[in-house]
Swiss-Prot record:
Keywords: Cytoplasm, Isomerase
PANTHER family: (4S)-4-HYDROXY-5-PHOSPHONOOXYPENTANE-2,3-DIONE ISOMERASE, QUINOL MONOOXYGENASE YGIN-RELATED
The protein's name: (4S)-4-hydroxy-5-phosphonooxypentane-2,3-dione isomerase
Induction: In the absence of AI-2, repressed by LsrR. Induced by AI-2, via release of the LsrR repressor.
One Gene Ontology MF term: (4S)-4-hydroxy-5-phosphonooxypentane-2,3-dione isomerase activity
Main location: cytoplasm
Organism from which the protein derives: Salmonella typhimurium (strain LT2 / SGSC1412 / ATCC 700720)
PROSITE patterns, sorted: ABM
Domain of life assignment: Bacteria
Length: 96
C-alpha cells in the first residue's frame, strides 16, 4: 500500500474556498480504481492548515491519480489559495 500525507496551508480568507475546491478532488479520487482512502483533515489548532491522507494500492494507482481531470483542476485552483508549496511525506502502509 502506498500512502501519502500532504500538508497544505492556505490564507486566512481562503479556507472555505479551499474546502470547495478540494471537495471535487476528494469526490473524484474516492472513485478511482486503486484508491483505498482519501481523507481531508483540518488542524483544529491552526484552521488554515489541512492534511490529505491518501492511500492507494500501489504506485501505479498514484500515477493514474495524477493524470485525472479532478486532480489537475484541483492543483491549478489551489495555487492562489496556498501560503506556500504543499509538502508531502510518502509511507509504506503496513497495517491499515
Amino acid at each position: 500500500m502506498h500512502v501519502t500525507l500532504v500538508e497544505i496551508n492556505v490564507h486566512d480568507d481562503k479556507v472555505e474556498q479551499f474546502i470547495d475546491v478540494f471537495r471535487q478532488n476528494h469526490l473524484g479520487s474516492i472513485k478511482e480504481p486503486g484508491n483505498l482512502r482519501f481523507d481531508v483533515l483540518q488542524d483544529p489548532q491552526v484552521l488554515t492548515r489541512f492534511y490529505i491522507y491518501e492511500a492507494y494500492v500501489d504506485e501505479q494507482a498514484v500515477a493514474f491519480h495524477k493524470t485525472t481531470p479532478h486532480y489537475k483542476t484541483c492543483v491549478e485552483q489551489l495555487e492562489p489559495l496556498m501560503t506556500g508549496p504543499r509538502t508531502k511525506k510518502v509511507f509504506m502502509g503496513l497495517m491499515p
